[in-house]
Amino acid sequence: MTYRVKRLFLDSQEVKYFGTFQTEGEAKMRLAQVLEEAFDEQGIDSSEGRGQIEVAMRNGYYHFREDGKVTSWFMVEGE
């Protein structure tokens, strides 16, 4: 089984992939990097985002909010 990291944009249904990995652990590490980059783009302080990234790594997904509404999902998906 392999694992992919992806982001699904809810408004357009566009999917962006961030790599394919041999283990779920590797994919979750990449998920953390992708989220950190997304937080930086949005100007979210890294210390504030760190706790959210830890939860995302445990769960394997994260819903991203902008202006109080969920705009996209980041997730690890097995295939």
Please place each PLM-identified region on the residue numbering:
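Ser/Thr- (and often Asn-) enriched beta-sheet segments in non-cytosolic proteins
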Residues: 2, 20-22, 54
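A short, charged, amphipathic alpha-helix used as a generic interaction element across diverse proteins
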Residues: 12-13, 22-45
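Short, mixed-charge low-complexity intrinsically disordered segments
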Residues: 35-79
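Hydrophobic beta-strand residues in large extracellular and virion-surface proteins
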Residues: 5, 21, 27, 31, ...
